[in-house]
């Protein structure tokens, strides 16, 4: 059954034959998912090779690819410049799918099914800064504001493993499970470690974009692996140390204001009036994270 995956707007285009390089050439200015971009395609019929260049300043992405279409399984090389970082990928195009992988396949690999559209990718990083993700002009914020994820036909699963959080020495072993389905962006079942002492598990996580406000909301479960060592890190007096096993809480994080709000906090499955009063007072202060 035919279906519309996306609508591409073309504002200006030129198609001509390059007599110097013996190539059919297309140059066009376009917009897709509210993201403007420039596209250049060169077809070398003699060598059966297509060169493609994609550039979008809004999402800070440059892509160059060379594809040989002589074989049944078409192979090529993809060079990406994303947030000032270069990535080279090999890819294979079959009838209804595309497989891609970096030279070190453990670093990046994935597949794309064309119909219906589905993207799955696995990425491994040695380190990343949360500032790159959550600052106001970060690529994540720009992508959400572009509404590129609002298409009901985009289905994506990303598994991202990050060894270290470079701007927080205590945080490590971040696993992000990002799903995009029918316009919803979820981070459910993601997790991160605080040293070796706490595991922070995101049971539910959802990005909400409404009237230029971006919020991240969900439910956290914090499991104590070595609570004594955690207390020692903050030099907490032994008289105030509680032998707790687990903390649960709902949260809302406003990415525009960098403010957290918490609710429904439980310690070892038990709520407390004193704790509720403390959380309410914290929420009312409007402290910036």
Predicted regions and their residues:
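Membrane-proximal interfacial segments on either side of biological membranes
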Residues: 1-289
């Amino acid at each position: 059954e035919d279906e519309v995956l996306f609508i591409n707007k073309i504002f200006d285009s030129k198609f001509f034959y390059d007599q110097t390089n013996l190539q059919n050439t297309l140059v066009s200015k376009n917009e897709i998912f509210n993201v403007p971009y420039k596209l250049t395609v060169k077809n070398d019929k003699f060598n059966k090779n297509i060169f493609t260049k994609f550039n979008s300043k809004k999402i800070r992405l440059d892509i160059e690819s060379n594809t040989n279409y002589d074989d049944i399984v078409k192979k090529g090389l993809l060079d990406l410049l994303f947030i000032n970082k270069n990535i080279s990928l090999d890819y294979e195009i079959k009838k209804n799918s595309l497989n891609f992988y970096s030279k070190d396949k453990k670093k990046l690999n994935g597949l794309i099914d064309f119909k219906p559209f589905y993207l799955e990718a696995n990425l491994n990083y040695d380190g990343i800064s949360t500032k790159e993700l959550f600052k106001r002009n970060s690529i994540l914020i720009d992508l959400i504001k572009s509404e590129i994820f609002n298409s009901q036909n985009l289905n994506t699963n990303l598994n991202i493993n990050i060894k270290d959080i470079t701007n927080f020495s205590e945080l490590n072993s971040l696993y992000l499970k990002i799903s995009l389905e029918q316009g919803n962006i979820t981070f459910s079942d993601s997790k991160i470690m605080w040293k070796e002492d706490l595991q922070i598990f995101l049971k539910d996580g959802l990005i909400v974009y409404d009237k230029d406000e971006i919020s991240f909301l969900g439910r956290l479960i914090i499991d104590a692996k070595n609570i004594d060592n955690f207390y020692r890190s903050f030099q907490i007096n032994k008289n105030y140390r509680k032998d707790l096993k687990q903390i649960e809480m709902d949260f809302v994080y406003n990415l525009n204001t960098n403010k957290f709000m918490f609710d429904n906090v439980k310690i070892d499955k038990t709520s407390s009036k004193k704790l509720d009063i403390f959380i309410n007072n914290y929420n009312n202060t409007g402290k910036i994270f």
